[in-house]
């Protein structure tokens, strides 16, 4: 289980030549994501999704609040957490001059996967993500979708318990997107915990057990897709999203 407790992140930006202004990109967010569950993090650009996920992944320090992974927290168990965690964003950069196979071997060694298990693990992941045809090709020659599959493979190599995926299918072709979505569903069936942000409402509706909608750094609605549709009297998550975002903006 991932438990997020009152996370806040404050930034300072220049208002004009003389004045600076403080603002909260994430303002007191709390939620839980359970084993065997995909929880979608939804919101417009600038809502605070990426900042939130970077704090949950331990890449960015919060101004206040904390995150628990079962009985672990970053203050006491940072190394243990990061060994059991996978984080991926849509714009993650990887080495262009080596092959996916070489990259996966390097990542496996970094995560201390047993040497006699590395090749079998790489072949298993290659099969799951349909990478066989380009496993030994130069990464710099791969398509965007193929490169993102390599990124997913890099996250999968150490068999993590927790996944934090930030717009993992953004800009991908339909085949690559579906492979990644199928992968997430299979990891959920294994009891893994998945946090997943996306701009694609249809995708979220099909794959997420629960969704958390964020605007201006605050949670504005949380529930199953069916619960949110019912609460907003809409027939799909896209319409529910616009109803909630519009209502939240009108209250300001």
Predicted regions mapped to residue ranges:
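Catalytic Walker B motif of ABC-type/P-loop ATPase nucleotide-binding domains
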Residues: 163-167
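ABC ATPase "signature
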Residues: 222-223
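Conserved ABC transporter NBD signature motif
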Residues: 65-76, 80-81
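Conserved ABC ATPase signature
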Residues: 138-142
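Conserved ABC ATPase "signature" region
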Residues: 105, 109, 116-134
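Helix-to-loop junction immediately C-terminal to a conserved catalytic motif
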Residues: 57
């Amino acid at each position: 289980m991932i438990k997020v407790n009152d996370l806040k992140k404050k930034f300072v930006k220049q208002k004009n030549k003389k004045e600076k202004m403080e603002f909260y990109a994430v303002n007191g967010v709390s939620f839980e994501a359970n084993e065997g569950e995909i929880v979608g993090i939804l919101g417009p650009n600038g809502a605070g999704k990426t900042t939130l996920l970077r704090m949950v992944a331990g890449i960015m320090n919060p101004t206040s609040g904390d995150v628990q992974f079962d009985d672990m927290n970053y203050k006491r168990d940072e190394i243990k957490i990061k060994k059991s965690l996978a984080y991926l964003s849509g714009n993650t950069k990887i080495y262009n001059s080596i092959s996916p196979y070489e990259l996966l071997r390097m990542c496996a060694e970094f995560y201390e996967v047993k040497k006699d298990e590395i090749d079998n693990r790489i072949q298993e992941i290659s099969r799951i993500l349909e990478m066989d045809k380009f496993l030994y090709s130069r990464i710099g020659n791969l398509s965007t979708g193929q490169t993102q599959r390599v990124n997913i493979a890099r996250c999968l190599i150490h068999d993590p318990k927790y996944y934090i995926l930030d717009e993992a299918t953004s800009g991908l072709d339909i085949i690559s997107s579906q492979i990644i979505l199928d992968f997430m569903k299979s990891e959920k069936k294994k009891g893994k915990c998945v946090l997943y942000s996306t701009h694609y409402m249809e995708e979220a509706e099909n794959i997420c057990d629960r969704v958390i909608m964020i605007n201006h750094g605050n949670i504005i609605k949380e529930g199953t897709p069916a619960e949110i549709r019912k609460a907003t009297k809409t027939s799909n998550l896209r319409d529910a999203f616009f109803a909630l975002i519009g209502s939240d903006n009108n209250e300001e």
